């Protein structure tokens, strides 16, 4: 990590179809080996499926799902006097989005549908309704933070 100056955040250009920066960011999270066109095909395919299945605007479903998955608190290990404590800390906004997208990707990968586009569509629809694997992960993280509330005075 450089000590001299803070490295500026790279600006991510909005995606071509919806003009949304979050969708473009999610495509980057989904992308493997620099194959952006494959990631685009998966995301847009999932959005088409959402429109077919739910009849809702896919961008609204995506925004709602990401909003539901975003964690508010998480736990970080802190060593105090020879013991490790799981200390609950608030998650900064940029990390909230990154975690939500990562959890969404992993939950979609674990589903049983045939194509990744179908899995992603299913996971997005469930997350927008407050269900699904990504929501389960968020609730698990929140439960851990709640259980370790007693150690919050060890904050960094």
Swiss-Prot record:
GO terms for molecular function: rRNA binding; structural constituent of ribosome; tRNA binding. InterPro entries: Ribosomal_uS7, Ribosomal_uS7_bac/org-type, Ribosomal_uS7_CS, Ribosomal_uS7_dom, Ribosomal_uS7_dom_sf. Keywords: Ribonucleoprotein, Ribosomal protein, RNA-binding, rRNA-binding, tRNA-binding. The keyword Cell inner membrane does not apply. SUPFAM superfamilies: Ribosomal protein S7. The keyword Secreted does not apply. GO terms for biological process: translation. One of its GO terms (cellular component) is small ribosomal subunit. Belongs to the universal ribosomal protein uS7 family. Part of the 30S ribosomal subunit. Contacts proteins S9 and S11. One of the primary rRNA binding proteins, it binds directly to 16S rRNA where it nucleates assembly of the head domain of the 30S subunit. Is located at the subunit interface close to the decoding center, probably blocks exit of the E-site tRNA. This is Small ribosomal subunit protein uS7. It comes from Ralstonia nicotianae (strain ATCC BAA-1114 / GMI1000) (Ralstonia solanacearum).
């Amino acid at each position: 990590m450089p000590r001299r100056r803070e490295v500026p955040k790279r600006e991510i250009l909005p995606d071509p179809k919806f003009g949304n920066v979050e969708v473009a960011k999610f495509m980057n999270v989904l992308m493997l080996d620099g194959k952006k066109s494959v990631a685009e095909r998966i995301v847009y395919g999932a959005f088409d499926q959402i429109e077919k299945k739910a009849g809702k605007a896919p961008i609204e479903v995506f925004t709602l799902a990401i909003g539901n998955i975003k964690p508010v608190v998480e736990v970080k290990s802190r060593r105090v006097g020879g013991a490790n404590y799981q200390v609950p800390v608030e998650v900064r906004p940029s990390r909230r989005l990154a975690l939500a997208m990562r959890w969404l990707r992993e939950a979609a990968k674990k589903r049983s549908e045939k194509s990744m586009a179908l899995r992603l569509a299913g996971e997005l629809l469930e997350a927008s309704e407050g269900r699904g694997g990504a929501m389960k992960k968020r609730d698990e993280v929140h439960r851990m933070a709640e259980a370790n509330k007693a150690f919050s005075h060890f904050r960094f």
